[in-house]
Structure formats: C-alpha cells, structure tokens
Amino acid sequence: MVADKGRRRFLEGVGAAALASGLPSHTFAAGPQEKSGVAPRKNSALKPFGFVIHGGAGTIERSRMTPEREKAYRDKLTEALHAGYEVLNRGGVCLDAVVAAITLLEDSPLYNAGKGAVFTNAGTNELDSSIMDGRTLKAGAVAGLKRVKNPILLARLVMEQSPHVMMTGEGAEVFAQQKGVELVDPKYFYTEERWQQLQKAKEAEKNPPPKRSKLERPESEAPPLKGATLLDEHKFGTVGAVCLDKSGNLGAGTSTGGTTNKRFGRVGDSPIIGAGTYANNETCAVSCTGDGEYFIRTVVAHDISAQMQYGGRSLSQAAESTLEKVAKIGGTGGLICIDRHGNFAMPFNTSGMYRGWIGPDAEAHVLIYRD
C-alpha cells in the first residue's frame, strides 16, 4: 500500500559517522526512526517497504565517465529498482524482488556480473552469487560458474531445493542442468571492454609504474585512497540488492564476476554468507562490494548484524564501524543495508559506488559519485 506522503520521510545526515563517509543514512519508515536496529517493531497500517541496490564500488570518477555511459548506468539501475518495486508493491516476497533486480543487472554488460563479468588470468569467466532469506536464515550460494547465465537464480535454487548452502564449479552446473536453469556457451559472457581490461591488467603486472612520492605528485592529483591498487578501476561492478517487504521480511543477494585477472579458482566475498551477503529479520539485510579478501577477513555482512543484535547499535552506526575495520587493514569497497524498520545505509570508502533506492512512493533514486 502506498504510504501517505505527509507521513513518510527520508532522513538524511543521521549520525556523524554517516556524514563522515560522504553518504547519509535514510529510512523508508512511516513512523519515528528507531534509535536501535533491534527495537520492537511498531504496529503501523502503512507497512513500509523498501528496496536498495548497488552496482559496485571502486574508482568511479566523473572525469572518466562520458555523459552517454553515465546515462546507461543510471538507466539500468533505475530499471532494476522498478523491477524490485513492482514485486514489493503488489505484496510480493522479498527474495522475488532481489532476484528480479539482480537478474536484470546480470543481463547487462555494464556490470561485473553475468554478461558483463570480468575475465580471469586464463581468459575465462567465473561467476559467483549468493542469496539469503532473513525470515528463515536459509541461504544459497554458488561459485566458479562458467555456463550459468544468471547465477542468482541458481543460488536461490541451492537454498530452496537442496540441503546445501554452497555449490561450486562443475557440480553446481550439473545441479543447474537438473533444475532447468539456463546454461549458455561461455562465449556469451565475452565483451570487448572486459577483454581489454584483462590485457591492461596483465601489462600492468609486467610493467608496474614507479611509485611517486607526495612531492612528485601534482597538486591537482588527489592522493590514492588507502588500500587502493593499480587495478582498482577494474574491481567495481559487483551487483547486489537488499529489501524489506510488506510482511516485514528482509532479504539480500549479491552477484559478481570477481576480479580481473584472478587466478587459481579465486573466490571473493560475494558468495560467502556472512561476508558478502547476510539477512536476518531480527536485524538487517546486507550486500557488499569491494576487496573480497578483506571483506571475508572482517566478516562484514554478519558483523553489521552482530553489532546491532549484541551491541545495540543502529544500522548506520554498525555499517560505518564495520567498514572502518575493512579500511584499517587496507581494504576498500562499500555496502548497502536495510533494517527491519526500513532504515537503510549505503556507506563506501572509494571514490564512487553505483547505488539506488526506491520506496512506497515509487520514486527511484540513483547515485554514482561520492558528492
């Protein structure tokens, strides 16, 4: 049900920590914002719902973006937001909205998931994905896929139609075939842009540029972010979604092609429940993007939930605190999260993150840069 605009609000600038990240926290809630993410739900006929997505965090700067390309990114994010909204507005379940949006992003060559997946060192594409139901705490994840068109669909089947949580490689694709999931020729994932990114990454490995001191760097050039590397520009693109449906259930999903030039079957945080994806109706739903190794080591997605459940922190406080832990050990990235009351946050410590949200008013909001 569409909430009355006079009673619905979007709070911005809640908490110094949120402001420090350059990204305010917001809420879809119709009533007063909760001070803690674990406070009892208030009875409300308005039944707020909300949907938040991301298309990856990384070195995303206006100076490198053409107007045409920026429009393409914004249009696809808007389309994905409306896909999730249509499910939630008619009273659909949270995970249907998550899958609807992520499938659209997986089918787009713009994002590092599905069709737009980056290449491994061997010149192949290896896809990872995960999904979690906050109501039941059931979860499904897949990794190392080479022929599954939409990994998020298979992750959900692992959750709902198998006794397992995670499947990988050939075994996962056998399961996909048995369940009727669409398989494609590996050539489907090829895009010239991603191929050229691989070539540049390999060349950078062979001929790394010399490090410059602060004195050698022009004043007009900003210093690199902590934890940044030469290949940061190839890391963004992971996609994810989190939502709160009208029944008060939370859900989260994430999908990625990993990192350009990865080797040896490397798997990042995206398919790791508790690191890249997590959902619990008692606290929040989270989807992450960034340096996967660091997000795994700090168990980002679950840590946010734990800080809320055991430490009494609000969603934005927990999200900021956890991302600070990532930065402290050298990691970069971002995340989206939403709690049981409709409060949500989208912090990141990179120069940009593709992100957006939509609520009962059906108005899609899309942001890319830090400012």
Located regions from the model:
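Alpha/propeptide regions of enzymes that mature by internal proteolysis
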Residues: 13-15, 19, 31-371
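Boundary at the C-terminal end of the N-terminal hydrophobic targeting segment
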Residues: 27-29
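N-terminal secretory signal peptides and thylakoid transit peptides that target proteins
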Residues: 1-18
